[in-house]
Amino acid sequence: MKKIQLFLLQFLLISITQHTNAQLPVKTEYTVEMGGTSGKGTYAPMWLTANRQGLSSANTENGYLRAGIAHTMPLNQHFSFSAGLDLATAYNFTSSFIIQQAYADLSYRWLNLSIGSKERLPELKNSKLSSGGMVESNNARPIPQIRLEVPNYVAIPGTHKWLHLKGHIAYGRFTDDKWQEHFTSIGNPYTIDVLYHSKSLFAKVGNKEHFPVEFEGGIQMSAQFGGDQYIAGQKEPVIDM
């Protein structure tokens, strides 16, 4: 086993929140970030690539420059709108230009419609752990999707705030077609144009106004479907789904 010596250099250059109107919760946030690794060995260790929302490289020599903007504004008493764009240019990544986030959200009270790629933390899991998740985790790039969700717990009427629910349903598309085609060796299968589906339902039982303990649990499902399967080196698909 080769000994890996690796050093991490990362700077958070700018993190600015600009309130454009003191009377309204309008917020615009700009971020600029630069990071890099330098060392010897075959691969970068997992603890330098985990919990990065996929913005990392397995190469021991790599770097990136990242810039983003996010804007949130109310439309009226019940509706609000938010959007964000987060781009990166990288060295020794799988791509030299990365659209990390590009999304628009429309919210009505507790219901939210999200379109695009957006970083999200896993449910019911400590996001600071590097072990990932059984279904999804923050070790992978955000998947472009249309997502209808109740992102925060909502008290169910008639339960006196003892039962709360949240959940989502989403459909999207994977964006690794070029990587699949380039990475797969001749004679082996790969699939492109793969679609994505996920849904979840979580419940919280408890009322801290009357009892200090709460119980939380739920179900979550993610699936791949559709797509066309090819054999590397051949032009025609072997399975057209």
What feature does the model see in each segment?
Residues A58-L65, S96-Q100, A140-E149, D193-K199:
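Residues that define the transmembrane beta-barrel architecture of outer-membrane proteins
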Residues E149-M241:
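Signature for the C-terminal beta-barrel architecture of outer-membrane proteins
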Residues A50-S56, D86-A90, S131-E136, T184-P189:
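Extracellular loop and loop/strand-boundary signature of outer-membrane beta-barrel proteins
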Residues Q23-T28, H71-S82, T94, S107-L111, ...:
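Short loop/turn motifs that connect adjacent beta-strands in outer-membrane beta-barrel proteins
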Residues T42-T49, T94-I98, K125-G132, D177-I186, ...:
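Outer-membrane beta-barrel translocator domains and adjoining extracellular loop/strand segments
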Residues Q23-L65, L75-L85, G167-Y171:
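Transmembrane beta-strand segments of Gram-negative outer membrane beta-barrel proteins
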Residues T28-G41, A83-T89, L106, L113-E119, ...:
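Transmembrane beta-barrel strands of outer-membrane/channel proteins
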Residues M1-V26:
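Bacterial Sec-dependent N-terminal signal peptides
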